[in-house]
Design a protein with these regions (language model features):
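Conserved N-terminal catalytic core of the sugar/cofactor nucleotidyltransferase
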Residues: 1-100
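Domain-wide signal for the mature, well-folded portions of proteins, strongly enriched
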Residues: 15, 19-21, 184-190, 194-198, ...
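Short phosphate-engaging motifs
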Residues: 25, 112, 224-225
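A generic structural motif
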Residues: 43-64, 130-138, 212-215, 240-246
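Short, solvent-exposed polar/charged micro-motifs at secondary-structure junctions
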Residues: 71-75, 140-145, 217-223
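Conserved core of the sugar-phosphate nucleotidyltransferase
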Residues: 94-102, 110-212
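C-terminal catalytic/acceptor-binding lobe
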Residues: 203-257
Length: 257
């Protein structure tokens, strides 16, 4: 399913792909994904004198959840926010010209044909946000549908997830305003149980581009996954050719392998 999300990002026109995955799992998954994927627009371009010389690689980066956030607020929504923040910090440390102005989110739990997104690239990259919908359901309805967001939405989403409780109660404070009583264990770190709708809400659907995916499967549980496996759409799904997506690594620079 992670491979499907990576391919979707490539068709949507992402410049880089950031996968949020902890260190204990990322080596295994990375061995399957690799370090980059070819841009399908340039790969399948049959025009020009030498199309093979105009290939464009989309690098893939791996981001682990910070240890201070694990088992505290590391829900799926926080992974989205943490991945966007990590890409911003890395890009801004290199050059102001590399700072991303929009983020595209793709979930491994939502499957649909990503090829139509290739024709929507120019609209996806506009200032207006983009949302994938299934029967008028979006991420706001706890569907694992893809969407984009910018700087303003990032601040709002991060504020929503920070509404979760911590370890200390805010009701019992001393004279200096410092909490003196801890919350019960079952009430601590409530953000790790947040649903998508708890964070990604009040979306600007009316002023944004909405793509209604004709065959979308929301893999929220085992039964929905079984329905996908038994569907006709599953029979049409195939892995991209090796020229586009295959395990490859970047060569070392100035070092011996």
């Amino acid at each position: 399913m992670i491979e499907a999300a990576v391919v979707e990002c490539a068709y949507a026109g992402c410049d880089t792909i950031w996968i949020v995955c902890n260190d204990d799992i990322s080596p295994v998954v990375r061995y399957k994904i690799g370090d980059f994927i070819q841009d399908p627009v340039y790969l399948f371009n049959g025009y020009g004198a030498a199309p093979s010389t105009t290939l464009r690689r989309i690098p893939i980066y791996w981001v682990p959840i910070h240890p201070k956030d694990r088992d505290r607020r590391d829900c799926l929504s926080w992974s989205v926010i943490h991945g966007a923040l990590s890409s911003f910090k890395v890009a801004s440390s290199l050059s102001a010209w590399l700072i991303p102005d929009k983020y595209y989110v793709s979930f491994p739990h939502g499957l649909f044909d990503p090829k139509p997104l290739q024709k929507l690239r120019t609209k996806i990259k506009t200032q207006n946000n983009f949302y994938v919908s299934s029967d008028n359901n979006t991420v706001e309805n706890d569907y694992y549908t893809s969407f984009t967001f910018g700087k303003d939405e990032f601040v709002k989403y991060r504020r929503n997830i920070r509404k979760g409780t911590g370890m200390w109660s805010s009701e019992d404070l001393d004279s200096r305003g410092i909490p003196t009583k801890t919350l019960p264990i079952e009430e601590r770190w409530s953000a790790k149980h947040f649903k998508l709708s708890d964070v990604f809400k009040e979306l600007d659907i009316t002023t944004s581009l909405v793509y209604e995916a004709p065959d979308f499967y929301n893999l929220a549980d085992w039964n929905s996954y079984r329905n996908y496996l038994a569907s006709e759409f599953c029979e049409t799904v195939s892995r991209p050719p090796k020229e586009m997506f295959y395990y490859r690594e970047f060569n070392y620079i100035g070092e011996k392998q």
